[in-house]
Amino acid sequence: RGLGDVYKRQDDMRPTPEMSFAIRHLGCQSGIILTASHNPKEYNGYKAYWDDGAQVLAPHDAGIIDEVNNIASAADIKFQGNPDLIQIIGEDIDKIYLDMVKTVSIDPEAIARHKDMKIVYTPIHGTGMMLIPRALKMWGFENVFTVPEQMIKDGNFPTVISPNPENAEALSMAVN
């Protein structure tokens, strides 16, 4: 199903892996995720995904860019789908996704033995805040701490230069 047939959107921020799951679970032809990923705010934009939930690759990527380059104005874009087919993705998909995630735990017994292990989590203002704390609780972890200043949705990433967790600076608030 393409945009002309069915349009599905999320009612709030969601992590990229959940969107990839939703594309496959709902049988969508493709999906678009508005994101900066783990890059600085200058990279805010979108990623296009195909029906397998993976990012669009060649040759489809070039075809999409060609179509985008043919648009002179946003006013030229016309939605030609049936509004009755619009479905908002929200808590229902969250539940299905988290139920699926729970089944892929490598060692549930190890988690049970170490459920009081101290875990510090920060989404660095990103979408992980929507599901990671819930997933950790669902798995049984009891000693989870978050970084409150970075649990605020903000695509400007005000507490870091870059939200890339590969940079030590991005995790300094969590470590301290």
Outline where the language-model segments fall.
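Short, small-residue-biased leader/transition segments that mark boundaries at the very start
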Residues: 2-7
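Gly/Ser/Thr-enriched, mixed-charge loops and adjacent short helices
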Residues: 44-170
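Gly/Ser/Thr-rich loops at beta-strand to alpha-helix junctions
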Residues: 1, 14, 39, 123-129
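A structural preference for short, hydrophobic beta-strand core positions in alpha/beta folds
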Residues: 8-10, 146
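Short acidic loop-to-helix transition motifs that present clustered carboxylates
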Residues: 11-19, 150-154, 169-173
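Short, high-confidence coil segments that cap the C-terminus of an alpha-helix
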Residues: 27-29
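Metallocofactor- and cofactor-centric catalytic cores in central/energy metabolism, strongly enriched
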Residues: 23
